[in-house]
Amino acid sequence: MCIRDSFRRMLLSGLLRSPSQLLMVVAMTLFSYYYCDGDLTTAFTDPKKLIIILIIAGGLFIGQFITMAICPALIKKYDVKKIYNIFSGFSAIPYALMFVVYLIAPTNLADIKWVIVDGILFFAAGAGFGAVNVCQSVMISDCIDYEEYHNGYRPDGVFFSGQSFITKFSAGVASIISGYVYNAVNYSDVNIDAMNNAIANGASFASDFSEYSKAMWFLISIPPAIGMAISVIPTLKYEITRESHDKMLKTLVEKHSQPEQQ
């Protein structure tokens, strides 16, 4: 077995997961238009809007931060591969359900019952996003330990540059997908200005610009759901288990604790 296979699997999984970045790219624009008439700052003067944003956006970020906090404890008890695959695979469900909920009530998602439903879905999606990011860093670190154990050197720079590449690639993929979808519904600078003027004069983003609303709900749900689901495929055969890594790490610690021979 080539030890670098583990890193290749992680790199491929990260690239396949790239569309999940759309949630972070598009969400605040969607929240601004759908819930706050194009101006997110109005949430600070309208209690109803503030509650909606706290539930929806708060759910997204709280879910992310909670899993980032508890993942280190989970990793001590379970294989990081298992945690990564579970969160990646199952978080595809809340992503997809966001669009299903939109299709059920496209103009009524500001009603409190739908706000609560979406808040739960955003919380679950954020939890998956946070857990996967933590696990990815840990798994890359494990790959570095394995490389040192088998080949005698630590390719920290090379391997973590791969993680940076995933981040930049994800941003690029998100831009391409969103650009294609926006172009399909004629969401251009001129039309955005016209929409802003119409909303300022009382138009509704959800009702009067439903094609834009649908495009944004699609972007934050379906491509990320697909990306999270297929990102599990490469890591199903990820070779490093918790037991094997503990064994390798113990050997490396003993090696580094020995005084260098003169």
Residue ranges and their predicted role:
Residues R4-Q262:
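Membrane-embedded alpha-helical bundles of multi-pass transporters/translocases
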